């Protein structure tokens, strides 16, 4: 979990669904990477869609396109070969990042999402 800087009593949340992960923590980053590798090597998935992906790229308050999260995935011999799809926003300040994700990433955008949703609903 992630606490508000300088306030150990309140959670920091840019997801709108509860609490944000402290992705800059080495232990959290390792847990994410181990989980992703497991799904690729053991369950044979070929890619991932990251909901509220901007949250994963927040180093402190801003979204960092050079964050450790992106860097370690790009350097990983297994994960760098998977399909990576970002929902490129969250509810935090500066969280709308359509067109701002690094190479190897595809971006899910709201217009596409709404079109697909309307199609399936009829």
Give names to the regions the model predicted.
Residues 44-46, 59-60, 65-122:
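Conserved alpha/beta catalytic core and glycan-binding cleft of carbohydrate-active enzymes
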Residues 1-45, 49-75, 94-95:
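Substrate-binding/active-site clefts of carbohydrate-active enzymes
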